[in-house]
Amino acid sequence: MLFAIGNAGSNIVETIRKESENAALKKIRNVFADCDENDLKKHKAEDCQLIHLNKDEDEFPNEIFDGIEKLVIVTGLGGKTGTKYAELAAKSAVDAGVTSVNVIATLPFFFEGNNRINLATSAARKLTDINGMNVTIVNNEEILEKYPDLDFFNAFDATDKKIMQIVKDIL
């Protein structure tokens, strides 16, 4: 299962869904979860499941992971939805007995401000403290440093492609 949480995660998984030529990625179950119902509607398709999250909930429904052996959660950290629900979903998946739980999370750009960066860093630490799963952190700022000619929008594309490769390697 490829599980997108929040706007950043959903945008990344949508790119993977549309652009990947990989047979395994074409067959995988795509799930999009967000607190914003309008954002969820952007990902409505026959091969996708949509989950509207209640921003006041502090639990995650375990039943979503019934029968799942391999899970890849994709999210951005530093905002509200991904920061909160990546941890809840990961714990829920581990508790539900998912054999392979992987979280791929992005860190914000510097220009997004210290509040988002601090929130993301704290969330990344919490994710790495969960036993029974793998966490990969993709730092958007490092992508800009590696490819200084990229503008802001192309940096997102580079991040999406990097994460697509990580997902392929996991599957």
What name fits each language-model region?
Residues 1-171:
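Tubulin/FtsZ superfamily GTPase core signature
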